[in-house]
């Protein structure tokens, strides 16, 4: 073979190799605060509620004992990356995206915790903030802090996908989410599949609970086909882009310009919504600043 032709082939192959998507399962240590053992027998119902929703959790156990004991715990971490993005998924904690960064500037575009320290927020108690929490069919779903099924798939177009999912025991709904990274693309894609194998109609929601490092420059761009907004326990709905519902917060003393949230319409502005600072702001100023 002509040496010049071989050199040209190698030069052409080098950038193609750099664009390859890599996927692997590794063991990594993460500082973790342990939780106590649950009741041996699952609790049917004790009148417990969580964030405005009924706390029926049977047949799941209740993980509501937090401890101050911190250990270095080994986790199975599923990693997915190309030359632009690097994703870490924890199948042992609900299949959540634990970390995601832009490799071009080392910026974590999802909020990344430095350790695992649960709080009593989830349906079953223990819950972790940060990253991306997948919620089907309820908010802060039952298995958010539990191990779920996972598999890896290499696709014909060169992309690679990590699928996480389960059969939810309370409603028997089957769901899976495929997190994909593509060659030479700087985004992460999530595809959702939900199957109702039961003979009954089931109510459900899908909520990707995304945590980010928020500042005055951060913007969230909403799809143009948004028609209404809902609170996170499927009870209250409101119009879009100007919502007048109280979002179940009539007793919550959140003040905007001297008014409680119950007295003040909630602004859902079309196109772009910026993160509001913690300072009080009148509705007139909000409309002036964000329109």
Give, region by region, the residue ranges found by the protein language model:
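Hydrophobic h-region of N-terminal signal peptides that target proteins for export
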Residues: 9-18
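Acidic-aromatic substrate-binding/catalytic surfaces of carbohydrate-active enzymes
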Residues: 22-60, 75-147, 286-291
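Sec-dependent signal peptide recognition
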Residues: 2-9
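A contiguous, surface-exposed recognition patch within enzymatic or periplasmic domains that forms
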Residues: 31-38, 42, 76-81, 85-103, ...
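Generic hydrophobic/packing signal
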Residues: 13, 104, 166-168
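Extended, loop-rich substrate-binding clefts of extracytoplasmic carbohydrate-active enzymes
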Residues: 44-72, 79, 129-187, 216
């Amino acid at each position: 073979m002509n040496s010049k032709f071989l050199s040209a082939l190698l030069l052409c192959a080098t950038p193609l190799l750099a664009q390859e998507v890599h996927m692997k399962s590794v063991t990594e240590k993460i500082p973790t605060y342990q939780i106590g053992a649950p009741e041996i027998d699952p609790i049917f119902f004790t009148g417990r509620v969580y964030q405005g929703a009924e706390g029926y959790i049977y047949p799941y156990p209740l993980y509501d004992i937090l401890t101050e004991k911190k250990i270095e715990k080994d986790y199975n971490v599923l990693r997915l990356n190309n030359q632009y993005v690097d994703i870490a998924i924890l199948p042992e904690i609900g299949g959540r995206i634990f970390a995601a960064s832009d490799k071009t500037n080392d910026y974590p575009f999802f909020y990344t915790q430095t350790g695992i320290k649960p709080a009593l927020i989830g349906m079953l108690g223990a819950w972790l903030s940060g990253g991306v929490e997948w919620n089907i069919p309820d908010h802060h779903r039952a298995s958010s802090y539990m191990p779920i099924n996972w598999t890896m798939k290499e696709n014909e177009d060169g992309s690679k996908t990590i699928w996480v999912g389960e059969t939810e025991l309370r409603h028997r709904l089957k769901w899976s989410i495929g997190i994909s990274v593509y060659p030479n693309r700087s985004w992460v894609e999530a595809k959702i599949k939900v199957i109702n194998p039961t003979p009954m109609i089931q109510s459900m929601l899908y909520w990707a609970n995304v945590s980010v490092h928020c500042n005055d420059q951060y913007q969230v761009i909403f799809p143009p086909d948004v028609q209404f907004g809902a609170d996170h326990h499927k009870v209250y709905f409101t119009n879009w882009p100007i919502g007048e519902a109280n979002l179940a917060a009539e007793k919550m003393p959140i003040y905007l310009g001297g008014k409680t949230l119950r007295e003040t319409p909630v602004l859902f502005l079309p196109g772009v919504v910026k993160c509001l600072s913690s300072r009080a702001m009148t509705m007139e100023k909000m409309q002036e600043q964000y329109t």
